[in-house]
Amino acid sequence: MSVSPVSIVSTPVAVSESPAGSPVQPAVPVTVRWRGSEAYQTSFDAMRAFTDTRTADTGDEIWVVEHPPVYTLGQAGDPAHLLVADSGVPLVKVDRGGQITYHGPGQIVVYLLLDLRRRKLMVRTLVTKIEEAVIETLAAYNLASVRKAGAPGIYVASGVHEGAKIAALGLKIRNGCSYHGLSLNVKMDLRPFLAINPCGYAGLETVDMASLEVAADWNDVAHTLVGRLIANLDGESAAADKPQALEHSND
């Protein structure tokens, strides 16, 4: 069954007066597009085209997608971090920051197409908001996770898999607008990570929520994550009706 993209929009709040009398900035609307299972190159070309053609009036968008198996290598990435040249998984060189990572079924990928100038966001602040959204999402499933200084992404906080990476992050900023985004491992085949130095770190363990004994539904986690992203970007709670479920596979 194919699933058509569905859009939901977070409603901006009205400008009001704070107790100190200074205006409170309204939330900036963002359209969430659920793109289903999509080839990485298709998403990559689409987000570049969206960013290249957007104007000051173009609305912000968040895209949620699941990719067939693919390795992506950041613009300053070292191909030597791909340890097995004939793995059968394609490699795509991209223009985001960071090194090499893997995308595949059972992983949530979220692309953030945001006008940072309009949102008055510094890149470091955006990264912090994204990381916090992932930490909050995992906490909703009773999983403790942390940031690591100098190593963008989210890592398991304690237990047998302490220090293992569960979410990756990489952005590109062009003309004050972001694209690319983050990936969160829910329930996937983790073996392709063994063929790379994930994010350029030799021997870095990569896990998913299933590895941590959380039997989470992909769609439920995706909606929790998107809700937290919107709330953090807006600086307030944000809720939206769930669109129809995406067709995806954890095989």
UniProtKB/Swiss-Prot annotation:
SUPFAM superfamilies, per the entry: Class II aaRS and biotin synthetases (SSF55681)
Subcellular location as annotated: Cytoplasm
Gene: lipB
Superkingdom of the organism of origin: Bacteria
Any GO BP: protein modification process
Function, as annotated: Catalyzes the transfer of endogenously produced octanoic acid from octanoyl-acyl-carrier-protein onto the lipoyl domains of lipoate-dependent enzymes. Lipoyl-ACP can also act as a substrate although octanoyl-ACP is likely to be the physiological substrate.
Molecular-function annotations in GO: lipoyl(octanoyl) transferase activity
UniProt KW keywords: Acyltransferase, Cytoplasm, Transferase
The name this protein goes by in its record: Octanoyltransferase
The keyword Membrane belongs to this UniProt entry's keyword annotation: no
Catalyzed reaction equations: octanoyl-[ACP] + L-lysyl-[protein] = N(6)-octanoyl-L-lysyl-[protein] + holo-[ACP] + H(+)
Enzyme Commission number(s): 2.3.1.181
Residues annotated to bind substrate: R96, G97, G98, Q99, I100, T101, Y102, H103, A168, L169, G170, G181, L182, S183
Other noteworthy facts: In the reaction, the free carboxyl group of octanoic acid is attached via an amide linkage to the epsilon-amino group of a specific lysine residue of lipoyl domains of lipoate-dependent enzymes.
Organism encoding this protein: Burkholderia ambifaria (strain ATCC BAA-244 / DSM 16087 / CCUG 44356 / LMG 19182 / AMMD)
One Gene Ontology cellular component: cytoplasm
